[in-house]
Every structure is written in structure tokens, then in C-alpha cells.
């Protein structure tokens, strides 16, 4: 029986997705799979945007941000009748293997294809938010972190010149990993993340102490899951006398050349994904834990909120920000 494997990217784009597409295609070909690409994620599967993927298609993309397969969100895919159409579009081409690169929403769609239609699916975690359970790191997190650090350095220049307190809102959805790591690596002076209580009075007290100790500017990292940074700015104004500004980094965090770490991680995850499918396993995601490649059921990845033990890192960030 001929083995045919399709690749799609879904949800928000993340640096490293192209490296994962490239490695998946190359390794799948090595194992004897005929490789197909699906444009625009599940929307493209539904609209039959499925095409044979040649080696030329993945040539020269390892260092490119975004995704050459494009990505989109599909509300229709949440309905069983549309998922059946999408699955049939695969089956009529003889495709029974699928690698899905994306976040938890992408995993839910993949798990339904596996459960309802028997499509042999493996997920690769691609999201800058680092909010997928079953893996220490997701594709794009490291690159995004470095983008934030670069922005912090520039913002610190103006904060220092004007003796200001600047709040920087970063992405992450419900997870504070980006803000936490950026605070530690970038020498942040305060942090607010959704996993921990964030009383404005505590932050204000910390900033006042910095002023007493002769510090004349502050950089505070605010994870988007905490709330609107402008609201936080207004509340903080009632507690401290220094001039406050807010910066929302926004979609610059999604783009850029993927870091070496993300390219290697993408390649390792892709190799594991194809290896798993070649062995006849499916319905799982691949991840990295303690530098080892692992798999976990997609169902588990979809149903469990990622709750890492972040207390020690949070305490470290607070200690270093004094």
C-alpha cells in the first residue's frame, strides 16, 4: 500500500514552522512517503487546497519566518459535517497520514480527525506562547523571546533618558512564559503574569523601593493574559509619582528569522513525528522534555492546561528585579 503523508500549519504563525515543514518533508521522503502540502490549514483541507510537495518547495526555507504553507482559522471545521468533507478530501487522494504544526486549537482539530475518520495524525507544537502541555518548549518561543529582548534594550534606552517607568505588554495568551523569561534574561524591573497574583500595590511598592535605592527608570514585563496594559498603567498612576508609558509589542513578536535553537528543535520534532507515523503510531503529539524527544496523546494535550512549576523562576525574577 502506497504511503501518503500531508503537512499543514494551523493557528497563529511561529518562527520555526518552515524548518519543521522542511524536515518533515525530507524525512518522510526518506521513509518512503509521498508528501503533500495543505495550504491555509484546516480551511485549505476543507477547500481541497492539497498539492504534491516537491523537494523544490521546501528548498531554502529553513531560515524563513512565518509559514510557506500559509495558515488560517476555520470556524466551519468545528462542525462534524465539514470535518467529514475535509477528511474525504484527504482520502480521495489516498492520504492517510497527517502532520499538524500548531497550537492547542490545531491539536483539537487533529484529534477529531483521528477519532472520527481514522486519519493517522501526529502534532508538532508550533506557537510562540509556549503554552502546550507535554513539552518544555514550543517552536517559535525562543525566537520570540529574543525579539522581546531586542525591544527591551531599545526601550530601556529611552526609559533611562527620560527617567520613566515603561510597561511592556508581551504575548502569551493565558501563559506567562514569555514575560517571565524576558524579565529574567532582559534584566526586567517588574513582572505581571496570569499564573501568579499580581496586586498593583505590590508592584508599586517594588518600584518605590527602586527609587529609594537610586534607580531612576523601570522596565516592567506584563503578560497579555493579565489584562489590558493601559488599564494597569492607569491603576499604577495612582500609586507612584514617576512618569509611566505603555508599549504593546504586538505582532512583531510572531515574525523574524528563527533562532538556531528553534531550527534544531523543529528538525528534531519533525524527525520524531515521521518516525512515530512510520511505526504505525498516531493520535499523539511530539515534545521535548529534559532534552529528550517524547510523545503524549493528543487528547491529553487538548484537555490539560499547561501548568509548569514556575514558582522558582517567578521568585528569581522578583529577586533580580530589585
Swiss-Prot record:
EC number(s) recorded for this UniProt protein: 2.7.1.11
Major localization class: cytoplasm
Subcellular location: Cytoplasm
Regulation: Allosterically activated by ADP and other diphosphonucleosides, and allosterically inhibited by phosphoenolpyruvate.
Residues annotated to bind ATP: 12, 73-74, 103-106
Residues the entry annotates as binding ADP: 22-26, 156, 187-189, 215-217
GO biological process: canonical glycolysis; fructose 1,6-bisphosphate metabolic process; fructose 6-phosphate metabolic process
Binding site for substrate: 127-129, 164, 171-173, 224, 245, 251-254
Positions bound to Mg(2+): 104
Entry keywords, A to Z: Allosteric enzyme, ATP-binding, Cytoplasm, Glycolysis, Kinase, Magnesium, Metal-binding, Nucleotide-binding, Transferase
InterPro entries: ATP_PFK (IPR022953), ATP_PFK_prok-type (IPR012003), PFKA_ATP_prok (IPR012828), Phosphofructokinase_CS (IPR015912), Phosphofructokinase_dom (IPR000023), PKF_sf (IPR035966)
SUPFAM superfamilies recorded: Phosphofructokinase (SSF53784)
Record's keyword annotation contains Kinase: yes
A molecular function (GO) term: 6-phosphofructokinase activity
Cofactor(s) the record lists: Mg(2+)
Pathway note: Carbohydrate degradation; glycolysis; D-glyceraldehyde 3-phosphate and glycerone phosphate from D-glucose: step 3/4
Catalyzed chemical reaction(s): beta-D-fructose 6-phosphate + ATP = beta-D-fructose 1,6-bisphosphate + ADP + H(+)
GO cellular component terms, A-Z: 6-phosphofructokinase complex
Uppermost EC category: transferase
Active site: 129 (proton acceptor)
Annotated function: Catalyzes the phosphorylation of D-fructose 6-phosphate to fructose 1,6-bisphosphate by ATP, the first committing step of glycolysis.
HAMAP family with a match to the protein in the record: Phosphofructokinase_I_B1
Family of this protein: Belongs to the phosphofructokinase type A (PFKA) family. ATP-dependent PFK group I subfamily. Prokaryotic clade 'B1' sub-subfamily.
Self-association state and partner proteins as the record states: Homotetramer.
Protein's UniProt name: ATP-dependent 6-phosphofructokinase
Lineage summary: Bacteria, Fusobacteriati, Fusobacteriota, Fusobacteriia, Fusobacteriales
Amino acid at each position: 500500500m502506497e504511503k501518503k503523508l500531508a503537512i499543514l500549519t494551523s493557528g497563529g504563525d511561529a518562527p520555526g514552522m518552515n524548518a519543521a515543514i522542511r524536515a518533515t518533508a525530507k524525512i518522510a521522503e526518506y521513509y518512503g512517503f509521498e508528501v503533500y502540502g495543505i495550504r491555509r490549514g484546516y480551511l485549505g483541507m476543507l477547500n481541497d487546497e492539497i498539492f504534491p510537495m516537491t523537494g523544490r518547495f521546501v528548498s531554502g526555507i529553513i531560515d524563513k519566518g512565518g509559514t510557506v504553507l500559509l495558515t488560517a482559522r476555520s470556524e466551519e471545521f468545528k462542525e462534524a459535517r465539514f470535518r467529514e468533507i475535509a477528511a474525504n478530501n484527504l482520502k480521495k487522494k489516498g492520504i492517510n497520514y497527517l502532520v499538524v504544526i500548531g497550537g492547542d486549537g490545531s491539536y483539537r482539530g487533529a484529534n477529531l480527525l483521528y477519532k472520527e475518520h481514522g486519519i493517522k495524525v501526529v502534532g508538532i507544537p508550533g506557537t510562540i506562547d509556549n503554552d502546550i502541555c507535554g513539552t518544555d518548549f514550543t517552536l517559535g518561543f525562543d525566537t520570540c523571546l529574543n525579539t522581546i529582548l531586542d525591544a527591551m534594550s531599545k526601550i530601556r534606552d529611552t526609559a533611562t533618558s527620560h527617567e520613566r517607568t515603561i510597561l511592556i505588554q508581551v504575548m502569551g495568551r493565558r501563559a506567562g512564559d514569555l514575560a517571565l523569561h524576558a524579565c529574567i534574561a532582559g534584566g526586567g524591573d517588574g513582572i505581571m503574569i496570569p499564573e501568579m497574583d499580581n496586586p498593583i500595590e505590590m508592584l508599586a511598592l517594588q518600584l518605590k523601593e527602586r527609587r529609594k535605592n537610586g534607580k531612576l527608570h523601570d522596565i516592567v514585563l506584563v503578560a497579555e493574559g493579565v489584562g489590558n496594559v493601559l488599564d494597569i498603567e492607569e491603576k499604577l498612576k495612582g500609586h507612584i509619582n514617576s512618569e509611566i508609558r505603555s508599549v504593546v509589542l504586538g505582532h512583531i513578536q510572531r515574525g523574524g528569522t528563527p533562532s538556531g535553537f528553534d531550527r534544531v528543535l523543529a528538525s528534531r520534532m519533525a524527525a520524531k513525528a515521521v518516525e512515530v507515523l512510520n511505526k504505525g503510531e498516531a493520535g499523539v503529539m511530539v515534545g521535548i522534555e529534559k532534552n529528550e524527544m517524547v510523545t503524549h496523546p493528543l487528547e491529553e494535550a487538548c484537555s490539560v492546561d499547561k501548568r509548569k512549576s514556575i514558582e522558582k523562576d517567578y521568585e528569581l525574577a522578583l529577586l533580580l528585579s530589585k
